[in-house]
């Protein structure tokens, strides 16, 4: 049960807990209608003010994701100051090689691994620290030059490379897709990523019994669920306040 109602943030932002509940219900209903498992919700907190973030963590303390390493550090400090437990942290934004040392072994999942250079550095630091770092390979399903992610035709070789390393655990795939006005227009990009996911799973490239297919954000999580996402990354929809 959420302890948001007994907190200062709960009084100021009651709609956040309501949004979480509504979204979880929508995910369950959409998955049931599509005949697929209910995906896991990973809240993205980059757009939240500090008090909004704390309200969300009281309402849904299970997991959270940040785009930038510095923002993640600040969120961790905020939780410590507030006396709240850390969620399962995911890093979903572009990760610079020189920032890898700050997150390996400290975040549960790096969702944006997209090059041999980056994965090799994650592995190097993980081995030095005696840990295995879970990663997802990010797929640039829209073939957008200004976005991160490996092109679909290069994804299998990158996955095969990751499987040779002892310090990383390849746990699945992630994609964003291009920004589109119609949610259903995302479906071809999600379907493409799902096809790669299914093929890699059949080939034994994922080192987990429950591989992750992370697709869908605030404007696209419904088509992502219908295309079989096992995880959705939602931010803005959790903080909307409609009078």
Regions found by a protein language model. Name each.
Residues 2-219, 227, 239:
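Conserved alpha/beta-domain cores
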Residues 229-243:
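Gly/Pro- and small hydrophobic-enriched strand-loop and loop-to-helix capping segments
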